[in-house]
Amino acid sequence: MPVLHNRISNDALKAKMLAESEPRTTISFYKYFHIADPKVTRDALYQLFTALNVFGRVYLAHEGINAQISVPASNVETFRAQLYAFDPALEGLRLNIALDDDGKSFWVLRMKVRDRIVADGIDDPLFDASNVGEYLQAAEVNAMLDDPDALFIDMRNHYEYEVGHFENALEIPADTFREQLPKAVEMMQAHKDKKIVMYCTGGIRCEKASAWMKHNGFNKVWHIEGGIIEYARKAREQGLPVRFIGKNFVFDERMGERISDEIIAHCHQCGAPCDSHTNCKNDGCHLLFIQCPVCAEKYKGCCSEICCEESALPPEEQRRRRAGRENGNKIFNKSRGRLNTTLGIPEPTE
């Protein structure tokens, strides 16, 4: 029986990936379809992906599959053919190819079985996830952006919206998709006569969100097919204006794809124009925040003076301090006040 999980350290795997000479292609895809036995499907897919040297993150559940992966360029077409042949429901599945890709997005394959492929918090037995809104293609998206009766709803987290979004799109302020769904219904109650256009990174969240809005009495609901990634690709291919401004946040080592030249966000430490996310270099913190090059040098990649000082301590002392510590929120949220370390320690007063 082959080993169906990784047994090599992350550091060794990352070093091996960085030493590779063959280019890689970053791909994302999802499909809502019934999987009778996610564990069996997971094990079969793990062997298929491993044989093709695929890295990335894959979630499976009874409701379908959600994947963000990195494939050696020479294996992309073989991967596509084998994926399509794996299950009739996957035949012809759209694969979103990354827009701004150095091929260094993942260095290990992690494949997990979950209750849902997107954590939505929905427990209504009458909810029909297949009753989705209408798809929009790139040209239709641009037409809707010029329609005064249309409202664009961003179904991504606040830190994704902060660095890039469609023109005049509404933010549903939340840290998670689970929090956003009820908020979207509440915020749109006064606009049921409007055309609701929902979007996300690659389509998986806005597809389910469109079904949730219809379940809650909204009848004019659309969502962008393939999300921001597919929209930007098709708009460029067709010579259309790209109406997404800024950067598209992605959940891998790149942390973003440049869509337009505009920088609409600011460094969370000094306020300078910047849209580069990073994780605090202190292993006891790892807060996700935006940091400009000047502050990165000043704070040595950390989110605060406290973390900067702690990360400079001997490794043994750092481990001692981390032991038993319960970290706080791992994502900086502008609405919660100024930037703070997640260590649960007050910043020194100035």
From Swiss-Prot:
Catalytic activity: uridine(34) in tRNA + AH2 + O2 = 5-hydroxyuridine(34) in tRNA + A + H2O
Domain of life: Bacteria
Entries under SMART domains matching the protein: RHOD (SM00450)
Pfam family for this entry, one: Rhodanese_C
UniProt-listed CDD domains: RHOD_YceA (cd01518)
Residue numbers annotated as active site: 200 (cysteine persulfide intermediate)
UniProt keywords, alphabetically: Oxidoreductase, tRNA processing
Matches recorded under Gene3D superfamilies: 3.30.70.100, Rhodanese-like domain (3.40.250.10)
Molecular function GO terms recorded: oxidoreductase activity, acting on paired donors, with incorporation or reduction of molecular oxygen
A biological process term (GO) from this entry: tRNA modification
EC code(s) of this entry: 1.14.-.-
Record domain Rhodanese: where: 146-240
Alphabetized HAMAP family for the sequence: TrhO
Database matches in NCBIfam families: PRK00142.1-1
Record function comment: Catalyzes oxygen-dependent 5-hydroxyuridine (ho5U) modification at position 34 in tRNAs, the first step in 5-carboxymethoxyuridine (cmo5U) biosynthesis. May be part of an alternate pathway, which is able to bypass cmo5U biogenesis in a subset of tRNAs under aerobic conditions.
Annotated protein name in UniProt: tRNA uridine(34) hydroxylase
Species for this entry: Escherichia coli O81 (strain ED1a)
Gene behind this protein: trhO
